[in-house]
Amino acid sequence: MIFVIGLGNPGKEYQYTRHNIGFIVIEKIANQYNLSFSTKKKFNCEIVESSVEKQKLIFIKPTTYMNLSGKSVISVKTYYNICSEKIFVIHDDIDLETGRIKFKTGGGNGGHNGLKSIDRVIGNNYNRIRIGVGRPQNNQDVADYVLNNFPRSEYEIVIQSIDKITNNFDLILENKLEEFKNKIG
């Protein structure tokens, strides 16, 4: 079983913000497999459950807002008895330049409130797909920065990153994590 969490905030006003890149990517991956999300209130998320290439697959988008993402993650993890090594969190990262992608297992949260919330309930030994959104300029507040939409000048770079993850997602299903890391990095 593979459990993939796209981090973001619910609501149209956040749909295309830097902080919602996790939602954007997970939706694109789900579309690739012709899968649709449905709301599960007991898990505080939108969820997709399916089998792809003989692999049970669960995608979620927490509906709790970023700072409480762990609430959804622990609910689904517990219900399906998923081990942390099979969890993949897709999220924005201000410490990476816009469009840069990094894959890692375990580690710190880099000040990311969604990851902090997840770490509190399941620890930090899970996989992360980090997507760079760049750092704010001119002393702009980080929270304001990540809650802004990507500027048009960054669209092409962001789309290429989303496509790179989506086009190589099958490698995760095949448990070829090192190859996935090399292809997206």
Swiss-Prot record:
The keyword Chloroplast does not apply. The record marks N9 as: Discriminates between blocked and unblocked aminoacyl-tRNA. The active site is at H19. Gene3D superfamilies: Peptidyl-tRNA hydrolase. GO terms for molecular function: peptidyl-tRNA hydrolase activity; tRNA binding. Its EC number is 3.1.1.29. One of its GO terms (biological process) is protein quality control for misfolded or incompletely synthesized proteins. InterPro entries: Pept_tRNA_hydro, Pept_tRNA_hydro_CS, Pept_tRNA_hydro_sf. Pfam families: Pept_tRNA_hydro. Keywords: Cytoplasm, Hydrolase, RNA-binding, tRNA-binding. Hydrolyzes ribosome-free peptidyl-tRNAs (with 1 or more amino acids incorporated), which drop off the ribosome during protein synthesis, or as a result of ribosome stalling. This is Peptidyl-tRNA hydrolase. The gene is pth.
